[in-house]
Regions:
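N-terminal membrane topogenesis motif
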Residues: 1-22, 74, 81, 188-189, ...
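Interhelical loop/hinge segments that connect adjacent transmembrane helices in multipass membrane
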Residues: 2-3, 140-143, 167-171, 180-224, ...
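Short runs within selected transmembrane alpha-helices of multi-pass transporters and secretion channels
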Residues: 13, 17-21, 25, 43-51, ...
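Alpha-helical transmembrane segments of multi-pass membrane transport and lipid-handling proteins
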Residues: 15, 52-55, 60, 81-110, ...
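Helix-terminus/linker motif at the lipid-water interface of multi-pass membrane proteins
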Residues: 22-37, 159-164, 221-253, 267-271, ...
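Helix-loop junctions and terminal segments of transmembrane helices
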Residues: 55-71, 250-288, 292-295, 341-348
Length: 389
């Protein structure tokens, strides 16, 4: 399938990723309120960290390696089974650590039930094989499946979440969305003639590549999510609710820029692998132009109408999110240029170690500013830390 068709399907996916929150967030924010939204953000973000450890970098590493072998179905299946086996082992181990933490950390024992339900995507994370279809450039399946599952979730949300006490139902619906995605992926994987077998051969070779990508992914996710976790531990769920509404408003629209990058990632890796330098540079130029075209207008838009956006989108109770949103709007430019250099340039050119060093430096600054600013400034401090770091 061509880059243009893949891009269109990925645009469909990202339109659904944008449209779904636009429909659900105003409803959920007004039903649950600031504190419950903050609590939801805390438990889901914490689980995402554990999912990241369970994945061991398979999303980027697996997609890149499958892209290199996409012309050989048998080799693709063999590599899949090796990575899948490693992922099963890591998922079981990390799930065990997660469940232990629910009983061993005081702040978590108070919301143990919510965290246990939110952990469903972690328990079954080995079944998340989006990386396989991404490597094969099967974005049609990824997009249509995601749209279907979001529609199911939307119906469940509107029917079942009616008041503040329904937070646990909201968390359950969110978790089941991941599980349904996993099941559909596995179904089509088997239907297309691929097989699933445990295979630990070449474990050391694959594990080395996974670990390198894992540390890069870990550093990036710490940068993206540590603010939420630190606010949950160092401040209140109210401050977290205010901050999460601001940062979520920005991140909802981030896929507009990253959609082309995800579509081009397998092809860029393939062109680099076969030495097609002309096509490789042509695609990078295209990606850079798209980022420039989208990032600056979005930043200007949110700087100008942040107050009206918060009032309309979240309601009056979220009014304090206006300033954090204006601060976070700078991320449209900063984060997307970082994504371009890190993922589309360094990763596809096999400069993972350089990417890791750059990301770790950013994480250190982000952690430092979070520690300094969150205690005194709360949501505003987390917003500044995200931009500066």
């Amino acid at each position: 399938m061509s880059i243009k068709k893949n891009f269109l399907y990925n645009i469909l996916l990202n339109i659904s990723n944008i449209a779904f929150p636009i429909i659900t967030i105003p409803y959920v924010s007004r039903i649950l309120g600031v504190d419950q939204i903050g609590e939801f953000s805390f438990v889901t973000t914490l689980v995402e960290y554990f999912v990241l450890f369970a994945a061991l970098g398979k999303t980027l590493f697996g997609s890149r390696e499958i892209a290199k072998l996409k012309d050989n179905k048998r080799s693709c299946n063999r590599l899949f089974n090796r990575l899948f086996t490693i992922n099963i082992i890591s998922s079981i181990f990390v799930s065990f650590i997660f469940l232990l933490s629910l009983f061993g950390i005081q702040q978590l024992t108070e919301i143990r039930c919510l965290l246990f339900i939110a952990g469903i995507p972690l328990y079954f994370s080995a079944l998340d094989i989006n990386w396989f279809y991404s490597g094969l450039e099967k974005f049609k399946l990824i997009s249509l499946r995601s749209v279907f599952v979001k529609l199911v979730l939307l119906i469940g949300l509107l029917c079942l979440v009616k008041n503040k006490s329904d937070l646990i139902i909201y968390v359950l619906l969110n978790s089941l969305t991941f599980l349904i995605n996993y099941i559909i992926n596995i179904y089509f994987f088997i239907k297309e003639g691929f097989s699933i077998r445990l295979d630990l051969s070449d474990c050391k070779v694959n594990l080395k590549g996974l670990v390198l990508f894992f540390f890069s992914s870990l550093a990036m996710q710490i940068y993206l999510m540590i603010d939420t976790v630190m606010l949950g531990f160092m401040s209140s769920f109210y401050e977290l609710g205010i901050y999460s509404s601001a940062i979520k408003s920005v991140r909802i629209l981030m896929p507009i820029m990253t959609s082309l990058g995800m579509v081009m990632l397998p092809r860029l890796s393939y062109c680099n692998n076969i030495g097609n330098v002309v096509e490789y540079r042509k695609m990078l130029d295209c990606a850079f132009d798209v980022i420039n075209f989208c990032s600056w207008p979005l930043m200007a838009y949110f700087l100008c109408i942040a107050d009206l956006f918060i009032l309309f989108f979240f309601g009056q109770s979220f009014g304090e999110a206006t300033l954090p949103l204006r601060i976070c709007s700078v991320l449209f430019v900063v984060s997307n240029f970082s994504y371009f250099l890190g993922i589309q340039v360094m990763t596809t050119a096999s400069f993972e170690s350089r990417y890791l060093i750059a990301t770790v430096c950013g994480v250190i600054f982000n952690l430092l500013f979070n520690v300094i600013l969150i205690p005194s400034m709360g949501a505003r401090g987390a917003a500044w830390a995200s931009v500066i770091g």
